[in-house]
Amino acid sequence: MHIQWYATVGRGDMFVDGIVRMAAPAALDYGATRYAVHRSRDDQYRILQQIWFDSKDDWYRYWEGPEMREFRARFSGKYQVPITYVWHDEYAAEELPREADDQPSAPEPVPAAGR
């Protein structure tokens, strides 16, 4: 699911923080397997919230649940309406594995003798 939020002028930082702290994590309590929040670098008021649900029923339980009703009421006036959301089917995704910080790094090169 993609939710296209648009913060009102001067409210971008406050609003994206509210999504990150309240709205996005609540989705996991309704069966979401993952969420992501993106903010446009070209337009700081444009915020994309992505949520991975297996069923639309779980999505609607989340969207109409008490946490999201509270979120929309608390942040009323800090985002533009209408709020648009669109169900997407994921067809492909891949990630490169990240190197763990606890792995030993390669040894430092030792200068050759006599130089």
Predicted regions: what they are:
Residues 1-2, 12, 22-23:
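Short, structured interface segments that constitute the first stable element of a domain
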Residues 1-6, 36-64, 101-102:
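Short, well-ordered beta-strand segments in beta-rich or mixed alpha/beta enzyme
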Residues 6-19:
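Short, surface-exposed ligand-recognition loops at beta-strand->loop->(often short) alpha-helix junctions
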Residues 11-12, 46, 56, 79:
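Enrichment for repetitive, rod-forming helical segments
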Residues 21-34, 52-87:
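An amphipathic, aromatic/His-enriched active-site/gating alpha helix that lines ligand/cofactor pockets
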Residues 33-45, 71-115:
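Glycine-rich beta-strand-turn "strand-cap" elements at beta-sheet edges
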